[in-house]
Amino acid sequence: MLRKGTVALINPNQIHPPIAPYALDVLTTALEASGFEAHVLDLTFHLDDWRQTLRDYFRAERPLLVGVTCRNTDTVYALEQRPFVDGYKAVIDEVRRLTAAPVVAGGVGFSTMPFALVDYFGIEYGVKGPGEKIICDLARALAEGRSADRIHIPGLLVNRGPGNVTRVAPPALDPRAAPAPSSSPSPSPAPSSSSAPVPVPLSFAAVGHHESRAWQAETELPYTRRSGEPYKVDNLRYYREGGLGSILTKNGCVYKCSFCVEPDAKGTQFARRGITAVVDEMEALTAQGIHDLHTTDSEFNLSIAHSKNLLREIVRRRDHDATSPLRDLRLWVYCQPSPFDEEFAELLAAAGCAGVNIGADHTRPEMLDGWKVTAKGTRYYDFADTERLVQLCHRNGMLTMVEALFGMPGETLETMRDCVDRMMELDATVTGFSLGLRLLPYMGLAKSLAEQCDGVRTVRGLQSNNASGPIVLKQLHQCDGPIEYERQFMFDESGDFRLVCYFSPDLPEAPGTADSPDGIWRASVDFLWDRIPKSEQYRVMLPTLSGSSENDNNYADNPFLTSLNRKGYTGAFWAHWRDREAIMSGATLPLGELAEAVR
C-alpha cells in the first residue's frame, strides 16, 4: 500500500516507572488505517540522549506532521507541585529546530488547558479530547498541500499568533453545553486571517467545555498494540520496566464530579468501544506476555451494562479456548463505589480481575454532596456502597485499595477524623489518604473558586508553593481569552510557575496558614500520621511533605515503584504496598499469583 506520508509521534514523558503511551498506539492505528506511516519516537527510554535521538531521526526522515502527547501537566499532587510542561516544551523547542513540519499536541493533560499550552509551546495545532480522527484529517489536509488558512477541521485548535488560539467548533455542539455567562462577555481576539472562523462570544461553551467528544473517538477498530518493532510503542518493554499494560473500554464520562477533569477533557458522553475490539486487543497483549492490564477508563463500572458484557466475553474466551492467552490475564480496574453488584463482582473475578481501586473519596454525606454527583447534581453513592464493594471483592478473592481525598471545601478535623476511622474499619488491602487538591481550569471546583474571587479578591485556602502574593483568580469572561483564563492555574503574572491548589481553610492549621498564599498544611499531615497507629501503617498510604517519610505515595519517580520493577514485580503497585519495607530492603519474597517476575 502506497503511504500518503509520515507522521512522527513523540512521547516526551521521562517519568519513571514508565507508563506506556497508549494514546500513540491509538493514533498509530488510526493513521495506518488512513494510509499514513506513523513513527513513534519514545523519549521515555532516552533520558540522557533524547536530543541526539531527535537529531538522528529528523536527519533521516521528513515527516509532514509531528504529534506530541502530553499525558500530565504536572504530578497533580498538591503537596509536591512539580510541573512537567517545561520538559515537554524543551522537547518541542528541539523539534522546532530540527524540522519545519507543523506540530500538534494532545493528551489528557494537554486537554485540561489546551489553549494555554498551544500558546506556551508555540505550536501550530492542538486537540482537546480523543485525537485519532482529528489527526488523520489534519494529516490528510497537509498531504493534499492545503495552506494553513485553508485548514478548518472541526475540533482542531489553531495558533493564529502569540496570545491568539482559536478552536474550530464541531458542526453540532452538545445541547447541554454550558451557557454563556450572564454578564457581558469579552470578545475573542480577531484572527489574523479573514478566512478564519468568525469568533463567538467568550463563554465556556465557546471553548468547548462540557461538550460531548464521542464523535472524536474510534470505537469499533481494535487498537494495534506492538512490542519490539522499530518506531512503534514497545508495550512489552513497558511491562517489563513498569509492571502494567493498559486497556481502554470507553472514553468520556456522563457524571459531573466537581474535582474531576474527565468530562471536560474527554467529553460528557460515553464513547463505548466495541466489545470484540477491546477483548481482541486484550488477547493480543496477553499473547505478547503482558499479563497485567489496568483499565484506563475514568471508572470501569460506570456504564456497567457495557462493562458486564465485556467481562462476559473475556470469560467466554477463557472458558471455551484452553489455549487462549486470556487465561493468563490479571485485570486491574478503577471503580466508583456504585454501581457495583454481586453479578459484577463475580464477573470480574471470573475474568481474572486481581484488584479493584475504589475512588470512594470520603465517608461523610455532607462532604460528598455537590462533589461526587451525576450530571443533574445528585450524589450517586454513600459509604454503605463502599463497604459493600469491599466485601464483595474480598468474598470473590480480589484485592482492594480504597482512596480518600481530604481538603475539599467544608473539610474539618471532625470530618477528616471520622473518614479515617471508618475507612480503616473496612480492612481494605490498602487504604490511601491524600490531602489537598490541584486545581485545573475547567473543574467545577476551580470555576467556583474563580467566581468567588471574581478577579478582585483571594479566597482562603487557595495555595501555591511558589506564590509570591495573594492568588486572585478571574472568571473566564473577565479574561482576554481562554489562554489567560487557563494560564492562571499554572503560571503567575510574570510567567513563572505557580501551580494553584486548594486546601480547606477549616482544617486545624497553625495561625495564618490558611491566609498565606504559600502556606503548608503541616498540621493536617501530622494529624493523619498520628491518627493511624504505627502497627497499622503498613497497609496505609499517607500524604507526605518533602523529607518527612521515605514512603512517598506519589507515582512520579517513586523509589518504591522503581524498586518493584527492578525486582520483576508486576501488577498495580499498591498490591505490594504492605510488603514495601521488605522489598526496599532487598529481601527475597515469594512471588505469588499477583506478582510475577517478567523473564
UniProtKB/Swiss-Prot annotation:
Its EC number is 2.1.1.106. InterPro entries: B12_rSAM_trp_MT (IPR030969), Cobalamin-bd (IPR006158), Elp3/MiaA/NifB-like_rSAM (IPR006638), rSAM (IPR007197), rSAM_horseshoe (IPR023404), Tetrapyrrole_Bchl_Biosynth_MTs (IPR051198). Residues 239-492 form the Radical SAM core domain. SMART domains: Elp3 (SM00729). GO terms for molecular function: 4 iron, 4 sulfur cluster binding; cobalamin binding; metal ion binding; tryptophan 2-C-methyltransferase activity. Pfam families: B12-binding, Radical_SAM. It comes from the Bacteria. This is Tryptophan 2-C-methyltransferase. It is an enzyme of class 2 (transferase). Residues 4-149 form the B12-binding domain. [4Fe-4S] cluster binds at C253, C257, C260. Involved in the biosynthetic pathway of the antibiotic thiostrepton A. First, TsrM catalyzes the transfer of a methyl group from S-adenosyl methionine (SAM) to cobalamin, leading to the formation of methylcobalamin (CH3-cobalamin) and S-adenosyl-L-homocysteine (SAH). Then the methyl group is transferred to the C2 position of tryptophan (Trp) with the concerted action of the radical SAM [4Fe-4S] center, leading to the production of methyltryptophan. Residues 167-197 are annotated as: Disordered. One of its GO terms (cellular component) is cytosol. Binds 1 [4Fe-4S] cluster. The cluster is coordinated with 3 cysteines and an exchangeable S-adenosyl-L-methionine. It comes from Streptomyces laurentii. NCBIfam families: B12_rSAM_trp_MT (TIGR04428). PANTHER family: ANAEROBIC MAGNESIUM-PROTOPORPHYRIN IX MONOMETHYL ESTER CYCLASE-RELATED, SLR0320 PROTEIN. One of its GO terms (biological process) is antibiotic biosynthetic process. It catalyses: L-tryptophan + S-adenosyl-L-methionine = 2-methyl-L-tryptophan + S-adenosyl-L-homocysteine + H(+). Keywords: 4Fe-4S, Antibiotic biosynthesis, Cobalamin, Cobalt, Iron, Iron-sulfur, Metal-binding, S-adenosyl-L-methionine, Transferase. Residues 168-181 have a biased composition (Low complexity). The keyword ATP-binding does not apply. Gene3D superfamilies: Cobalamin-binding domain, tm_1862 like domain.
